[in-house]
Design a protein with these regions (language model features):
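Long, well-ordered early-domain segments
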Residues: 92-134
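Alpha-helical scaffold segments in soluble metabolic enzymes
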Residues: 36, 87-90, 103, 110-117, ...
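Residues forming the flavin
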Residues: 2-84, 123-127, 132-137, 141-298
Length: 298
């Protein structure tokens, strides 16, 4: 006999009309917004359409572009916010507000510090994972990409099975990072780097199982770390709860109506709603409206 899976985390909390400070729609990196809000003293609720937590983040490579960040500084990358600003100005070329790029750069260090305080995530520099356009002013072939070190998903305890599975689940556990893939792909040409890398990750994965650990990497590690942080501070998550519509008082957003178990539930959000549910990239109409009218012409 199997026990039905609870639609809430923690289990047993009621799904009913409620009032919070901030509503987060989507349980991928929206969990980072939830943790930030919690640190600011706000009450937070996360709603997730599927039965799993992690969203598309858990199925991604989990890489973060973190220019002039503490991670790069600790590894002697020699990057600066000024160089990163020059690069963004070169590649974005006026297609987005300059203040948006400036705000991103201004908050990189704060974001890294927040992840370190609130989650078990530990980031490393994916050295030589080049910027997409290293030839542009401010670009760098050494790259500014950072990624999660392999993380033991067993820290989620009873909620480990609620983490969205990765795209490529294999029978042999081998938590592989982006940096690892580089040498694995070049193993035929550079076996002295490829073989030790494979042995290291295979040993970590199989050895971890023997010790009761379940290491994950990439987006799985990022999602698991954020999930662990959310569970630790008790931010509630409603799974199997899809956004139906936003509510408004005519002047501003006041919350949302979500569908759960065949009924509608109203969540009033005093400070706002964060839409982190993904799907935007699948709507060409929205992409043309909010990104560029020329998308899809070539």
């Amino acid at each position: 006999m199997t026990t039905a899976q609870s639609p809430t985390i923690p289990a047993g909390i009621p799904v009913r009309d409620t009032v919070v400070d901030l509503l987060i729609v989507g349980s991928g990196t929206g969990m980072a917004a939830a943790l930030t809000a919690h640190e600011c003293g706000l009450t937070v609720l996360i709603v997730e359409k599927s039965s799993y937590v992690g969203g598309s983040t858990a199925r991604s490579g989990g890489a973060l572009w973190l220019p002039a960040s503490p991670i790069l500084e600790e590894n002697g990358a020699g990057d600066t916010a000024e160089r990163a600003e020059t690069y963004l100005r070169s590649v974005v070329a006026g297609s987005a507000p300059a203040e948006r790029s400036a705000g991103y750069l201004r908050n990189v260090t704060g974001a890294v510090d927040m992840l370190r305080r609130t989650t078990p995530i530990r980031l490393s520099w994916a050295k030589d994972y080049s910027d997409y356009h290293p030839e542009e002013p401010g670009g760098t072939a050494a790259g500014r990409t950072c990624e999660c070190r392999p993380l033991d998903s067993a820290i989620l305890g009873e909620y480990r099975t609620r983490l969205r599975p990765g795209v490529m689940e294999v029978n042999i556990p081998m938590p592989t990072t982006t940096a690892d893939y580089r040498w694995m792909n070049l193993m035929a040409r550079v076996p002295r780097r490829g073989m030790p890398t494979i042995a290291k990750r295979l040993g970590q994965g199989v050895g971890g199982l023997l010790l009761g650990r379940r290491y994950v990497a990439g987006g799985q590690a990022l999602a698991a770390g954020l999930f662990a942080g959310v569970v630790r501070v008790g931010i509630p998550i409603w799974t199997d709860s899809a956004l139906h519509r936003l509510t408004t008082d005519g002047a501003q957003i006041t919350g949302a109506v979500v569908g759960h178990d065949g009924r509608e539930v109203t969540v009033t959000a005093r400070r706002g709603v964060v839409l982190a549910s993904g799907g935007f990239d699948h709507s060409m109409a929205m992409r043309r409206k909010f990104q560029s009218e020329s998308l899809g012409e070539h």
